[in-house]
C-alpha cells in the first residue's frame, strides 16, 4: 500500500474528490430473487458471474458531494503525496448509535492496494471515538468489489432496499458491531 494520510475533508478537497473515478469494473453481481407464496415471502441474493466484465457507474452523481459534504456527519479523505486519492462519507445516527458508510471511493489507478480498507478502518475509529455501537456499509448490488471488501473486513449482510438509489439500483447494507 502506498504511504497515505487519512484526515477530515476541508473545502478545497471537494472539487478534487469529485474528479476521482467513482465507477467500478466487475465480473460479478449479486442478483436478487423474490419468491412469494401463500404465507411466505423469501428473498435470496446469488453471486452471479457475468459473461464479460461490466463498468458499473456510481449510483449517485459525484457532483452531489459539493452540496452534501457539509451535511454529512463526516467525510474522511485519503491523500498520497498531497493528492486526494479517495474518501468516505459518513452519516451518524446518534439515537441508535450507528454510523453508515454512505460512500467509499478510491481513484481507479490506486485500487486493490489497501486504501479502501484503510478508509473503512478510519471510519470505524471515527465511529468508536463518537461512542457508536454499530458500523453499517452501504453499496449497490452491482458493486462486487465493495461486497467482497465488506466480507473481508468482517461485515455481515443486514438488509437490502430495492430501488434505493436515483438510478433505481438495489442497495445492500452490511454491518458489524463495534463494541
Which residue stretches match the model-derived regions?
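Short alpha-helical
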Residues: 12-15, 96, 144-145
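Conserved acetyl-CoA-binding loop-helix of GNAT-fold acetyltransferases
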Residues: 106, 112-125, 148-152
